[in-house]
């Protein structure tokens, strides 16, 4: 792909165009990336003032002791990727460099130098999968910059040349730099890695460094626009953690290197995305894992940058729980948390003010809960959007639900990419007839949404969130899912509500076209399911119960379906089952599907349960 740098120089107005005429005298001396010379003292003071920061600091030091006993990372690919080795190199070098700056103990310096020299000797950093290059470049750039004055001249030369020849120069190869024009996590990660490299070697190669910094300022604007209008990240929880963390690593490095000259004019959607991410985790600690995402929640370093930038400690409510856990995160960016939390105390972190959060954009989502502080609170996530987004699944209209600390309605999430790629699956083809949609976990058949006439959702269909309300007693959101079923339905709308903080309603209002349609309603769960009547089923897990009750149609036959996949390449789904029902709707007819999810002890309010979606409260609050 031939790339037009002028395009990015023009588009960089909303961020910053750093003129190539900048010279190295305008940059701080080494260390200049994220933590300037002398800033260690303030960091030490903050760590000493809070036992959680102190525990995090000592966890990093303990990990460094383990790293010192390990051989350096080797160039060993998994499939087409070197990424796990690049990530481990970044973890090691970042941790060790941090440890040296905070303790001045030579063992950390020596081990970081060994790690960097080993990576510098690799034949390449696998530019055909450029994420690998980006993370390795960031690793060596942090070590080179933070340890610059202590490295021998020979080591400096070898590491600097590796950053340039194996990191920066390959980013101009048009066979590998397609990510410059992308609007997803690849852009954020790769531009961050290249910018770290440019900042590290600025004084010896100012022309190359300036060109890369200037290029990144325009290019990284593209994915940052995808957070508009209100912060919902199209790729979901896991890739928010990846793309956004590297995006703020980029911003943090630029802010420190250029000071007041750097004013990126961050868009509102990007800044609001921290609230989106915080709301994505339920009381159980499990995230809403739609799209390519694992099941568990995890510490998100970028949240600490947002909390500091917005002066809003409540953004760290979920992160606080991860830090308080017995086993701290081993995230490769963990030292950045201590840099970005400087001046904040764990005791200053309060719960968020709102119990509902709605995000529109390319992949809309609504998130609601009855409480932030009660571990037994009800939590619901409802997804609109489109299968066509990067890393998307056929999950428009799908939802997750938990109560009493149990995730009752779940999402299987992603399958390991290499397991599918090595089986020859055409995984990254997003067209309607792609083999991607034959993967069990990726299509609508296994998600908590509808299947019409046994067909896949329409890939280029889009389901907006059309209404929501934060009204106490009737938290709700509604999505128009017509477009993903447009071949078979004239209209389809799904609403989900939490009623009186006690139970959940899932309501679908449908209209068929000129043909009869068979509608399947599905709920995926890891609970034990017992059909207790035509319209009711009991779910049991961890000694707790939930009743699934269908109030419309008046009579259906609930059933269960196996989650054993049909293809050898599909991952197993042990301990899960699907429950639901099928109905036939005549041509040109309307139908209502109304399902209640009643945690143990909850009593239905029939006057609310029977209300149409048009009767549900709606507001336009800016959550």
Description of each model-found segment:
Residues 73-80, 138-238, 246-249, 335-355:
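Active-site lining segments of carbohydrate-active enzymes
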Residues 25-79:
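Low-complexity, Ser/Thr/Pro/Gly-enriched N-terminal "stalk/linker" regions
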Residues 30-49, 90-106, 118-126, 136-154, ...:
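Well-ordered alpha-helical scaffold segments within catalytic/enzyme domains
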Residues 178, 201, 242-408, 467-474, ...:
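Carbohydrate-active enzyme catalytic cores, enriched for enzymes
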Residues 24, 319-324, 419-623:
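CBM-like, beta-strand-rich accessory domains located in the C-terminal region of large
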Residues 1-11:
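Bacterial N-terminal signal peptides that target proteins for export
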Residues 60-72, 110-127, 158-178, 211-231, ...:
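Long, well-ordered core segments of solenoidal/helical folds
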Residues 19-21:
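C-terminal motif of bacterial Sec signal peptides marking the signal peptidase cleavage site
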């Amino acid at each position: 792909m031939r790339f037009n740098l002028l395009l990015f120089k023009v588009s960089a107005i909303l961020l910053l165009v750093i003129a190539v005429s900048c010279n190295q005298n305008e940059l701080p001396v080494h260390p200049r990336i994220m933590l300037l010379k002398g800033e260690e003292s303030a960091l030490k003071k903050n760590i000493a003032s809070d036992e959680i920061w102190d525990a995090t600091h000592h966890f990093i030091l303990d990990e460094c002791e383990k790293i010192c006993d390990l051989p350096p990372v080797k160039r060993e690919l998994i499939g087409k990727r070197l990424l796990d080795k690049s990530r481990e190199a970044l973890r090691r070098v970042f941790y060790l460099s941090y440890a040296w700056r905070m303790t001045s103990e030579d063992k950390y310096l020596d081990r970081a130098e060994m790690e960097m020299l080993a990576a510098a000797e690799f034949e390449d950093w696998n530019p055909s999968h450029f994420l690998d290059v980006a993370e390795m470049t960031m690793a060596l750039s942090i070590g080179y910059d933070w340890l610059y004055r202590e490295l021998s001249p020979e080591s400096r030369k070898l590491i600097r040349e590796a950053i340039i020849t194996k990191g920066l120069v390959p980013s101009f190869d048009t066979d590998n730099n397609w990510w410059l024009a992308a609007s997803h996590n690849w852009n954020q990660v790769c531009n961050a890695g290249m910018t770290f490299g440019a900042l590290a070697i600025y004084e010896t190669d100012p022309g190359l460094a300036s060109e890369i910094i200037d290029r990144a300022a325009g290019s990284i604007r593209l994915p940052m626009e995808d957070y508009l209008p209100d912060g919902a990240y199209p790729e979901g929880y896991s890739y928010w953690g990846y793309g956004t963390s590297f995006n703020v690593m980029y911003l943090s490095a630029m802010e420190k290197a250029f000071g007041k000259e750097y004013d990126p004019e961050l868009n509102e959607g990007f800044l609001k995305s921290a609230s989106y991410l915080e709301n994505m985790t339920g009381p159980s600690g499990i995230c809403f894992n739609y799209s390519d995402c694992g099941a568990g929640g995890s510490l998100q370093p970028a949240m600490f940058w947002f909390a500091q930038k917005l002066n809003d400690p409540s953004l760290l409510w979920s992160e606080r729980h991860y830090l308080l856990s017995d086993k701290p995160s081993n995230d490769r960016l963990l030292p950045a948390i201590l840099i970005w939390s400087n001046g904040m105390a764990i005791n200053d972190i309060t719960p968020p003010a709102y119990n509902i959060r709605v995000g529109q954009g390319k992949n809309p989502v609504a998130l609601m809960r009855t409480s932030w502080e009660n571990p037994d609170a009800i939590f619901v996530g409802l997804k609109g959007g489109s299968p066509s987004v990067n890393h998307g699944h056929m999950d428009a209209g799908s939802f997750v639900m938990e109560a009493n600390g149990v995730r009752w309605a779940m999402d299987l999430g992603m399958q390991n990419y290499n397991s599918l790629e090595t089986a020859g699956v055409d995984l990254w083809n997003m067209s309607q007839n792609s083999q991607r949609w034959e993967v069990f976990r990726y299509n609508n058949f296994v998600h908590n949404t509808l299947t019409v006439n046994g067909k896949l959702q329409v890939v280029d269909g889009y389901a907006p969130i059309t209404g929501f309300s934060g009204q106490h007693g009737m938290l709700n959101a509604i999505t128009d899912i017509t477009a993903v079923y447009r071949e078979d339905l004239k209209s389809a709308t799904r609403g989900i509500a939490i009623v009186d903080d006690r139970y959940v309603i899932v309501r679908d209002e449908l209209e068929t076209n000129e043909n009869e349609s068979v509608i399947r309603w599905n709920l995926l769960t890891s609970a034990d399911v017992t059909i207790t009547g035509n319209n009711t089923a009991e779910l049991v897990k961890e000694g707790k119960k939930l009743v699934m009750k269908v109030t419309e149609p008046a009579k259906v036959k609930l059933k269960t379906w196996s989650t054993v996949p049909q293809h050898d390449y599909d991952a197993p789904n042990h301990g899960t089952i699907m429950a639901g029902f099928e109905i036939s709707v005549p041509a040109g007819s309307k139908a209502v599907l109304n399902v209640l999810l009643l945690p143990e002890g909850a009593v239905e309010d029939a006057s609310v349960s029977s209300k149409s979606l048009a009767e549900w409260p709606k507001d336009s609050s800016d959550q």
